Amino acid sequence: MTNIRKTHPLLKIVNESLVDLPVPSSVSSWWNFGSLLAACLAVQILTGLFLAMHYTSDTATAFNSVTHICRDVNYGWILRYLHANGASMFFICLYIHIGRGMYYGSYMYSETWNIGIILLFAVMATAFMGYVLPWGQMSLWGATVITNLLSAIPYIGTDLVQWIWGGFSVDKATLTRFFAFHFLLPFIIAALVVVHLLFLHETGSSNPTGIPSDSDMVPFHPYHTIKDILGILAMLTLLSTLVLFSPDLLGDPDNYIPANPLNTPPHIKPEWYFLFAYAILRSIPNKLGGVLALVLSILVLAVIPLLHMSKQRTMMFRPISQCLFWLLVADLLTLTWIGGQPVEHPYIIIGQMASIMYFTIILVLMPATSMMENHLLKW
């Protein structure tokens, strides 16, 4: 008798994705982050669902409802901090996942890569709107500053901002719609994840060597299920350590002050995972130029497949490209640090230099180095 997992219409899909899926035998732990992201999304949707049961999206009561969740709801504090720090874990996994894609040439599967970029934008939008919901000082002013950037769009900018706000400033209407979208978007993200996997399973996974691995495959279960479970346990250990010992480590103290439109915080900044893009935005004195640079800092990922000049797919056997890749990582860490600093000397010039470096490495140095390495292969 044939196994039910191979014949049942629903179980067959699960079987082909999680049990009998052929995986290259050489994939390393850097391939774990896809499943970690799925785990993060599950944690965020579950904790968010329970938080939404107690939260009120009204400017008069939003801050107090979050306080009520932390003080009066059974295990409300752990739900709130799991959700807030879960977002940080989400972005750590996301950035490592993208970095692995760049290092090992996974971007050559262009459909999977492009869906991934759409997913990144969706996750960033969700996280931004979530940051507004507690209605602290940084929530209000962060929302005001970031949404105001759209006013740089010629002709329609001002009208667009007022349309998003639902009035002439960030107020009750803005908070209500942000809550609605913050609740909706994770389910859209989950649907996009399915599409992401659909495209991935059309081509099969890449591997560290960059060499076709059709002749050397292992089944996903039990080898990679065990490996993924280990990764998920490690991530949950890190997350629970953060939540139980230092829940406010990555947050901003200003968000414990109720939102006050009459009092501007001395230094407005987003959550740490947006600081690199915020630093790029601030490094350009012109408003429209800054907004374009901000969008391009993420959209530049879309041109990476077009700039692949190397005869080898991965960077595994390309030491000069490896140095450039880690230089890019160091540059992003520098931008993250600069984004959290006040706008004054020497931070301004460091931010401008790091922003130029970011685009130069991706758009100029990496393709040029690939061509040089191709030439060296002929020796």
Swiss-Prot record:
Q: What else is known?
A: Heme 1 (or BL or b562) is low-potential and absorbs at about 562 nm, and heme 2 (or BH or b566) is high-potential and absorbs at about 566 nm.
* Keyword field: Electron transport, Heme, Iron, Membrane, Metal-binding, Mitochondrion, Mitochondrion inner membrane, Respiratory chain, Transmembrane, Transmembrane helix, Transport, Ubiquinone
Show the Pfam families listed in the entry. Answer: Cytochrom_B_C (PF00032), Cytochrome_B (PF00033)
What is the name of this protein? Cytochrome b
Role summary: Component of the ubiquinol-cytochrome c reductase complex (complex III or cytochrome b-c1 complex) that is part of the mitochondrial respiratory chain. The b-c1 complex mediates electron transfer from ubiquinol to cytochrome c. Contributes to the generation of a proton gradient across the mitochondrial membrane that is then used for ATP synthesis.
Q: What topology does it adopt in the membrane? A: Multi-pass membrane protein
- Please name the source species: Pteronotus parnellii
Indicate where this protein is primarily found.
Answer: mitochondrion
UniProt-annotated location(s)? Mitochondrion inner membrane
